[in-house]
């Protein structure tokens, strides 16, 4: 249904033409700063068989994906220390590394014990040391944990590498035979598991703030209806059954309310449901389409997409009353709003001019400037990491729907590994630890 509404908005936008941008706003298309060089040395392994996952590779990829760090390739490393006493700082200074991480993995009673240490190369001082244990199957979990600890120590920002991702795949076997699958994976696309399969479309999956429930739109009754599902048990509950469109669910920050879009009274508008009483209240009204709600962290403000001004733009409104305030002014299409954790940045799907080139962009909410983050052309469904450092979005490559990751500073752009078929509708989890 989100794609249907987006299509409606695109048509309206094309008919409306291109409006002039507010002169006080600025469009930025690229940056010039560089990521900090870091060396994550392959961890020593004192066991017999080969481990299924390379911890150093996973940690390096995590730090790279943040856009803050540039890992030094293994083939460029002069030495391969596995413990603090083996670190020769002149080797890493010669390579231009500002930080170096070493570690070792030791089998212990059927489990693995991992020791790691992080050093500042310039000062030759230890920045972080620690240990973590787990099973062989938890190698990726332990790697993401070390990434989280290291990133927070170096930047002061909580790491988001132990989070999860929801997305939908569509695998078409024939004209009337498509299988839709709701998947959950690590944030980087690894270890995907199936939560739901259907012969009808699944749209707009969203994690609840507790990370234990999800809401999504299913067409299994041949019309869009919103369901809530418990991840651990698979128990599902249908929560809407209104005439017309039922879609775009969005959890409130405390998980007690759910915003969504209904067209039961005419045009699509945003409503809020109290999850305890199941009572609903209307947030938007008037002509035009109002869709894609996203909550501010105060639990009272909702950002949303509306074409009330003649073309799709982002607005915000208080659920307790009052008019809507326009937020975006650059470009003739701005939709799918998401806020960074500090609420200083608005991430959205943006089109500067013309009728193509839908790209992920970030707007500084204090200055009004907009920075285009991607170089793809048909972007949609952007979702932001809970620490605001990374964005995952859906786009098309070689005629196929894929997921891409881009750092919020624009330094890193890369595809995520996913299953066969069309991949769409990504949604990032909250912190899970």
From Swiss-Prot:
Location(s) in or outside the cell: Periplasm
GO biological process, one term: protein import
Gene coding for it: tolB
Identification of the protein by name: Tol-Pal system protein TolB
Protein task: Part of the Tol-Pal system, which plays a role in outer membrane invagination during cell division and is important for maintaining outer membrane integrity.
Family (UniProt): Belongs to the TolB family.
Pfam families for the chain: PD40 (PF07676), TolB_N (PF04052)
GO-annotated cellular components: periplasmic space
Summary of subunit composition and partner proteins: The Tol-Pal system is composed of five core proteins: the inner membrane proteins TolA, TolQ and TolR, the periplasmic protein TolB and the outer membrane protein Pal. They form a network linking the inner and outer membranes and the peptidoglycan layer.
Keyword annotations of the record: Cell cycle, Cell division, Periplasm, Signal
Residues in the signal sequence: 1-21
Organism encoding this protein: Pseudomonas fluorescens (strain ATCC BAA-477 / NRRL B-23932 / Pf-5)
UniProt-listed PANTHER family: PROTEIN TOLB, PROTEIN TOLB HOMOLOG
